[in-house]
Amino acid sequence: MAGILAWFWNERFWLPHNVTWADLKNTEEATFPQAEDLYLAFPLAFCIFMVRLIFERFIAKPCAIALNIQANGPQTAQPNAILEKVFTAITKHPDEKRLEGLSKQLDWDVRSIQRWFRQRRNQEKPSTLTRFCESMWRFSFYLYVFSYGVRFLKQTPWLWNTRHCWYNYPYQPLTADLHYYYILELSFYWSLMVSQFTDIKRKDFGIMFLHHLATIFLITFSYVNNMARVGTLVLCLHDSADALLEAAKMANYAKFQKMCDLLFVMFAVVFITTRLGIFPLWVLNTTLFESWEIVGPYPSWWVFNLLLLLLQGLNCFWSYLIVKIACKTVSKGKVSKDDRSDIESSSDDEDSEPPGKKPHSSTTTNGTSGTNGYLLTGPCSVDD
């Protein structure tokens, strides 16, 4: 075990040339980031999760009810043993051939069977009230952590001149505010990693999981080798648009369409400006070029920058999706459902007739009535 730890914490990988871990031990004069500091993130992540449960129950839910957001779920599918067996044991999305077979077996029309499967799938979806509470929690946290980051960074020299991220590196003392900011962010992303498995399931689950994982790696990496100064710039930039998105979701759930549209436009502008403009031109410029000039490259420097480039790749992907929904918004006149939406269709869009005999109605091969579908957005949908 000692050999494995020695290999993992190899100074030639983690630190610049001619720097050792002994040089970064805490002294009476200065405190530096220590790897063991990060253990604090785990109990704090649990505390954040518990605070979230309390917040959603006693603050977000009353707010949702005050806005007339009901807890009613989607329409319940009519009990049917045959269809239930197919749904649970075979497929939740029957193809056209199976639909025709079930239609003959039950003497139902195909459209009624499609509706049954859609309603049955939607039974497992959370209510609008649940979505509102989840978004209100994220809005509150993102707003707080972004506000804290701005208040902290405006007092630092590296906000105004990024070369200060590398002067005297890695012998840069760790301040209490920087330590709190880092541990809070790391704890929140650990809580997201866990809660993602219990939250509303979205189609880009894998992408978001990769995003959270990359963020945790970045925070951990930059803390351990004391790249925390530039790390605070990355964190604050990537927090800047999140509160606007969650606010747009809340407006959408409350059916304040004009407010939703305005907030989404504000989110899109801030997101694209910060992640496609400021981040590469300001942050990547300092991590790739200014640090090379002042400190020089070393193995963990390459890994850190590769993680930042991975994050930028996700930013480009999400920006493309945001532009796509923005174009559709212009053509349709309002923000609509998107590809991350966990709702396949609204029961209000369907005929409410009960399953009956077959008057073969027109259907599409994908099992919808031809009017349901998804519009794409970015890292989080407006209607998810």
UniProtKB/Swiss-Prot annotation:
Question: Where does this polypeptide localize?
Answer: Endoplasmic reticulum membrane
Q: Give the tissue specificity.
A: Broadly expressed, with highest levels in kidney and brain (at protein level).
InterPro entries registered for this protein in UniProt:
HD, Homeodomain-like_sf, Lag1/Lac1-like, TLC-dom
Q: What is its EC number?
A: 2.3.1.-, 2.3.1.291
Per the record, ranges on the Lumenal side are 1-34
Is Phosphoprotein among the key words of this record?
yes
Instruction: Report residue spans for region: Disordered.
Output: 335-384
TLC domain location: 130-331
Keyword check for Ribosomal protein: no
- Gene disruption: observed consequences: Mice show behavioral abnormalities including a clasping abnormality of their hind limbs and a habituation deficit. Knockout mice are protected against high fat diet-induced obesity and glucose intolerance. Mice show decreased palmitoyl (C16:0) ceramide pools and increased energy expenditure. Conditional deletion in brown adipose tissue or liver also protects mice against high fat diet-induced obesity, while it is not the case with specific deletion in myeloid cells.
**Induction profile:** Up-regulated in liver in response to high-fat diet.
Q: What is this protein called?
A: Ceramide synthase 6
What is the taxonomic lineage of the source species? Eukaryota, Metazoa, Chordata, Craniata, Vertebrata
